[in-house]
Amino acid sequence: MLNLCHALRGVRQFSCSVIVKVKCASCSIKLQDQDPSKPGYYTKPKSLPDSKLNPDLQDLKYLLFSQDIQLSKQAIQNDPDLKTKRDLLLRVICKRCSNALHHNNYNPEEFPESTLNDILNYVPRGSNVMHIVPFVEFPLHLDPNVLKRNDLDTTLVLTKSDQVFKDKNAVSKKVPIFMKQFLKNTLRIDSNKTFAISALKNWNISMFYNYFKNYTYLLGNPNVGKSTLINTLLQKYLGYKVKIDSTGKINSPSEEVMQEAFTNPKNFFKIQAAGVSHIPNLTRSGQAYQVGGKILFDLPGYSTSTSRLRLEEPIDERWLQRLRKTDLFNRKHIKQKTYESMKGTSQGGCYTVGGIFYLVPPKGSINQIVKYIPGPSKTFKNIEKGIDVFNSCNSSSGTHPLSRYCGIKSVICEKSQYKRYAIPPFIGSIEIVLKDIGYILLRTTGRYEFKGLHEIWIPRGIQVGIREPLENLIESGYQRYIETNGKESSCPRDRPIISSLYEMAPDEADTLNAVKKSYLEKTEKDLSARRFVDDDPYDLVQHLEKKKNPYWYYQW
């Protein structure tokens, strides 16, 4: 987004006149050196560089003197030239990003959340918008408020599809048909503008590029894959940052900078790339990119819930990095679907991954669990035992024999810090989705017999939902759609396929009746969604083969 010629022209004295032309290479905010309490601040060194150096280069190195960047050290050893000045300038990052990215000093208060209205201030009315949603956590992150806006031309883009499907065939052909009918049936949105992609696997990227229009904005929650998608496009179509002034004029990099795309493509891409990090809310300002013949805007992520828990508070930093780094996802789980078995017990036996959640099957049920969340799993006699063990792990500074299973901090090592949720009745398999964490597949085995509701205990503030297994749902729906020449919908109409869960009091014994009561309350203003309201709950759950997914209701 910098006009490099202007940025490097006439730099003689170190001052804010230099900095105001430079944005942080990580979060895109304007740099300043006057007020440490304000965004964009960077730290001056205590001592000056060698005064014999070219004065222009000295000023630029002065910006990076206190930052732990290997490239600046290497440049100081070499004879300075214009290229070195440009490289140093383009790699300047603010103190906030430097601390978080290079020194593991992360203060959540310095990464404030934005609302949808905050981000829409960057987007002119009538603009082309790509609503970015990670398919792996569908339907979480999907925002009907974006899709229903009449003042935007919106396309739904489902990222991280490689974490759901074995190959891109379903992603290319089957997902768009399914989503068109899902949006129409569930949200009354009539749209055929849906793309499922994988930026890491390069699935459908060419199709996506051919589709999106000039001057398109990427809109979505933090860490949904916007910057990763942009970087894939930059590499594939030789893209770069540009600056657009108030008159709409596009200021592109100089001819010298563009020449480096051919002489040193790795360095060129490193300079032009969008800032990708596992840290949420890292991007703080819009950034324009020239991708082929089109302009694409990367926007900061926005949050939809004011009560959302920052995962940095309860979850161990190393575990959190594994959860958030998409490239660490092990796709063998998609292909092999290796499961763990667990039987429900009278003591409340539970299954957990790191203490991030506790799944409690009903007594006597036999369950298979396929885990798509990084980290080792563990079963305990009950939730209290699990919390007690993880509390000991935190107290022992890593010396406890079960420390490798602990992914939470001491702040969450109390049962009162968790919410108890009842999962509405189901038969066969479901997927439990935890926002910004991942999902697990839960399957009950043997001949169906209602033994009680499954429960899951989750730290307060983490959003959770369930869905029918997504890959099977789309594959079987597509087959039905093709066999009937499109007469039957690929998305089921006879039942809901997604649902929120129902919060229960810790001492609630009759969870089934409590679920029905909550269901009636949630659907009070959506009567058309109600099903089986006249049935006795305990009679209803005896016939789930015919009356599927009772009390399923997703609250958008």
Curated annotation (Swiss-Prot):
Any single Gene Ontology cellular-component annotation: mitochondrion
Q: What is its main location?
A: mitochondrion
InterPro entries from the xrefs? G_CP_dom, GTP-bd, Mito_lipid_metab_GTPase, P-loop_NTPase
Q: Which CDD domains match?
A: YqeH
A molecular function (GO) held by this record is: GTP binding
Q: Mind listing the UniProt keywords for this protein, alphabetically? A: Mitochondrion, Transit peptide
Q: What is this protein called?
A: Genetic interactor of prohibitins 3, mitochondrial
Q: What organism is recorded for this protein?
A: Saccharomyces cerevisiae (strain AWRI1631) (Baker's yeast)
